[in-house]
Amino acid sequence: MTNLVQFPGLGLSFHLNRVAFTIGGVSIYWYGVCIAVGLCLALVFAFRHSLEFGVDPDSMVDVILIGVVLGIISARAYYVAMAPFKYESIWEMIAIRDGGLAIYGGVIGGFLFGGLACKWRGVPVLPMFDLTAMGFLLGQGCGRWGNFFNQEAFGCNTTLPWGMYSEATRAYLMSSTVTVPKGVVIDPNLPVHPTFLYESIWCFVGFFLLFRYIKKRKFNGDITLRYLIWYGAGRFWIEGLRTDSLMLVPSIGLRVSQLVAGIAVVAGIAAEAYFTRKFKGKPLLVPLALNAENKAAQKKLDGPISFAGKDTQLLASSPRKLFLEKTEAYNAQVKAAIEQAGQKKA
C-alpha cells in the first residue's frame, strides 16, 4: 500500500510504500531500515573513534550489544507506558513494525543498562557515554526518517512552504487522538509541520557541532552533557508542535516529553557549568586503552602490569593517528611485560 505525500508549497510529491522489501514473504519496513542505518552509522563512529576516548573497541562490543537491545526494549516500554490502555494484548504491546519507539525511553535505557555493562566489562563509563551520545545523534537523525515513511510524528498546521500533507495526516487529524494545546484549531485538510524533519536536522547539526568539539572537551562526560542540553532544547521546541504527544498540562500545552527535555536541559547546564569550573585550566588526559587480550592475561597474574609516565596517556586534543600509534605500542609493551612476568612466575 502506497501513500501520496505532498509538499504543496515546494511543488513536491512522493508515493511512499512503508515496506522497503520482502524476504521470504516477510515484509521489511522502512521504519526498521532507517533505525538500522542509524545504528550502523553510530557503530562505525564508535569503533573508529573509541581509542580517542580511551575505550578498547573489543571490550565495548558487549556493552554495545546490551545497550542496544535493552535500549530498544526500554524505548518500547516507555512508549507503551504513556498509553497502556490502548493495547488489547501483550502482542500489540511488543509489536514495533508499525512504529512506536520513544526516543527518551531508548536514551534512558541505553545509558542505564550500558553503564551497568561498562562496569561488568571494565570499560570506562563516562568516556563510553560520550561515544554513545555521539552515536545517539546519528541514530536519531536517521531514525526519524522512519516516521516519514510511516507518516507519523508530525505537527500541527503550518503555512510554511515545507508544510506536508497526506491522507495519513488528514485521517489522523480527523481522529479523536489528536493532542494540541487548549484553543488551538486543527484543519485536517491543510499541510502540517514535518517535525520528523526538524528533529532529524537538529540531530545532524548537533552531531557536527559536537564532532568539532571532541578535541576540545574539558572532562569525561562533557560530550554527554552537551548532548543532553542540545537534544533537550530541540526536543522541547519540536514537541510543542506535535499533535500526538501525551499532554501533562493541557491548558498550557505542556507535554510529558517537554518536561523530560526541560529537566535534561536544566540539569545539563548546571552540571556543565559546575564541571567546567572544576576542571578549568586542567587539560583532559586520556589513558591509553588496554586491549581485551592484555586484560585477560593480567587476571592470571598476581597483580596488574602498569607503567608510569607520559606514554600511558595522551591529551584529548591529540590527533587520532597518534592515539592509534601510542595505543598499539603501549599494548605491545604490556604484552611483553606480562610474558616476562609469567616466565618468572613459572
Give residue spans per PLM region.
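A feature for loop-to-transmembrane-helix boundaries and adjacent hydrophobic helices
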Residues: 1-346
